[in-house]
Amino acid sequence: MNQFYKKSHYSIQKHQITGLLFLLFIYPFSTSYGNEQFSFDSRFLPSGYNYSLNSNLPPEGEYLVDIYINKIKKESAIIPFYIKGNKLVPCLSKEKISSLGININNNDNTECVETSKAGISNISFEFSSLRLFIAVPKNLLSEIDKISSKDIDNGIHALFFNYQVNTRLANNKNRYDYISVSPNINYFSWRLRNLFEFNQNNDEKTWERNYTYLEKSFYDKKLNLVVGESYTNSNVYNNYSFTGISVSTDTDMYTPSEIDYTPEIHGVADSDSQIIVRQGNTIIINESVPAGPFSFPITNLMYTGGQLNVEITDIYGNKKQYTVNNSSLPVMRKAGLMVYNFISGKLTKKNSEDGDFFTQGDINYGTHYNSTLFGGYQFSKNYFNLSTGIGTDLGFSGAWLLHVSRSNFKNKNGYNINLQQNTQLRPFNAGVNFDYAYRKKRYVELSDIGWHGNLYNQLKNSFSLSLSKSLNKYGNFSLDYNKMKYWDNAYDSNSMSIRYFFKFMRAMITTNCSLNKYQSYEKKDKRFSINISLPLTKDYGHISSNYSFSNANTGTATSSVGLNGSFFNDARLNWNIQQNRTTRNNGYTDNTSYIATSYASPYGVFTGSYSGSNKYSSQFYSASGGIVLHSDGVAFTQKAGDTSALVRIDNISDIKIGNTPGVYTGYNGFALIPHLQPFKKNTILINDKGIPDGITLANIKKQVIPSRGAIVKVKFDAKKGNDILFKLTTKDGKTPPLGAIAHEKNGKQINTGIVDDDGMLYMSGLSGTGIINVTWNGKVCSFPFSEKDISSKQLSVVNKQC
């Protein structure tokens, strides 16, 4: 049980180590990382002793415990405990029980629910390892990955700013500046977002507002509301910016098992039969069915993709077997699920000359026949578009999509037909994808109408094909082909590329051959390239070398050699050095040098680079970061993402949080984790190897489920103090017996230890002054400690009379 996490340097004598090791063995929750149950043989106790660890009743208070539901660890949490009868029992509220995924069947709203009346089978607390075991009937358990609205954290009220400043200087005279400022407000579940941008090109300056919008999520309805300037989000139509209002399904609010397409198993049983569905050697369905048709949905909790083998055994022992292959496309949804998107507003000037008013809607619906139906409409001045289609899983031949759209602009009709296919040939470790589209000349998209129909240079048809094949230890092979044809033939193009990636010893090698043909150029563009990357060190702060070469039939050859790497365990300092050489068919040769570095600090990310040759030079500098104003003060951080976590460890700096480079607690104990998944369980983890000396944390891991756009506050309790090994004697000259429990109460938190067989007591995180109470067999003794006892940074051994 991970109750305390610290970084200490121990220096004690040999006979003290023996006592300490024994103490750590019988008291894992104080210093160790074990989760196992411990016991010992009472025959090894001194004669005349008649006690055990269980004979001393621990004090009431709050304990950090590991919670197990039906012997499976659910989480670690601080739980209040009180004495009932001769046991220490947990105080579980209705909200806490619900957060554990248990649906209790009574309306007990008291502070501590009577668990036996709520349908919970049994609760037991193992104090020696601080583990709380809860036995619950399966019918009271929620879905494994189900999240209720009560679990969602809307975060704190905050005013926060993101900023970025870029400067580029070319040949020491041409200067380009860019500044972006994003002032944002979070209030309950409402989000106000803004972006302002400044550009300067020498003496030419522009300042503009990029967007402003207000957003709110409704988790129970699984929808998202946006008012202002935003982007469409459609699986039916192309996406573009608009000003207006949108109401749409937020697919992030669904768990994968609720929204992602998985196949359904259909069949017919001739008699009462046993149905077994296997994926490889794993049984994911084992059910009895009566005679007649049957159907089983496959959930994501059971299924990881690939071929399924179905076995039907009737009452006479006869067996029938068949195979179910499946593939999917992004448009496909879980059977019975509907996803929708409705918008009204005006196209922004970026997409339309006139900013015409429009309305748009689209719906996707997953059917029970391994298919998804979808359709939509767009309506604007002199314009109408109606779209419909189907995506279906046809088994071995893959997933297919047929999409038909019809437009009418100023009484001129056009249509677009799109056919897509995706096949994953898993037995062959291969995949095939193609996409074909044909447009009638008068077909117009919504974004074209502001430009008077944009009937010039219209696309006639397009075709793309992608093949990929895994060669296992021999690498990966892929082929891509694209063809586009226009009605006036002005921009017709063909392109093909063949790529082969493989690993040789420690080197990673990629080769690529490409062929491109454009209508506006008479000559075909043929290119060959090779890239070699070789790691020179194995640790995380790695250094790699790289070499690349490319040659074109135009006579241009380019080669590059360089080194890149990172420093520190979290790679917060990165660097890159390159030397490039370009030779053209006219004999001209250009040599260019490039050097760049970036540093991620708790307060922002800073980047600089320089490139130059004998004819030009270029310098680039960038700084980005964030400022968060909240009820507990101000935090200077890296840029906040769409959904973030503000971690607080009281006034303790330089503690590493998560895996993002440079995210450490700042001078006031705050750190920002910039990117969380909305409506999903996110684990906030402290790197225990980076905890400074003299700091003890009650926990290094917490879990949050933020709403979209939230800044959730995550507080870790920490204590500044040192570790002490007390040598205890009682007033009569004896020592407290093995298993005597010591505790020091600091606020609500209890610092606990256990006495070993030589009277040695190990306590961690002690600071200032205090009183430690020791209890055994109904007896109690106390002793004080002071600053003098804990002045050493190393483990101190202090004699005390109790």
Curated annotation (Swiss-Prot):
One of its GO terms (molecular function) is fimbrial usher porin activity. Keywords: Cell outer membrane, Fimbrium biogenesis, Membrane, Signal, Transmembrane, Transmembrane beta strand, Transport. Involved in the export and assembly of C6 fimbrial subunits across the outer membrane. GO terms for cellular component: cell outer membrane. InterPro entries: Fimb_usher (IPR000015), FimD_plug_dom (IPR042186), PapC-like_C (IPR025949), PapC-like_C_sf (IPR043142), PapC_N (IPR025885), PapC_N_sf (IPR037224). One of its GO terms (biological process) is pilus assembly. The keyword Transport applies. Transmembrane segments: none annotated. PANTHER family: FIMBRIAL USHER DOMAIN-CONTAINING PROTEIN YDET-RELATED, OUTER MEMBRANE USHER PROTEIN. Gene3D superfamilies: 2.60.40.2070, 2.60.40.3110, 3.10.20.410, Outer membrane usher protein FimD, plug domain. This is Outer membrane usher protein CssD. It holds the Pfam family Usher. It comes from Escherichia coli. It is a multi-pass membrane protein. It is found in: Cell outer membrane. Belongs to the fimbrial export usher family. The keyword Nucleotide-binding does not apply.
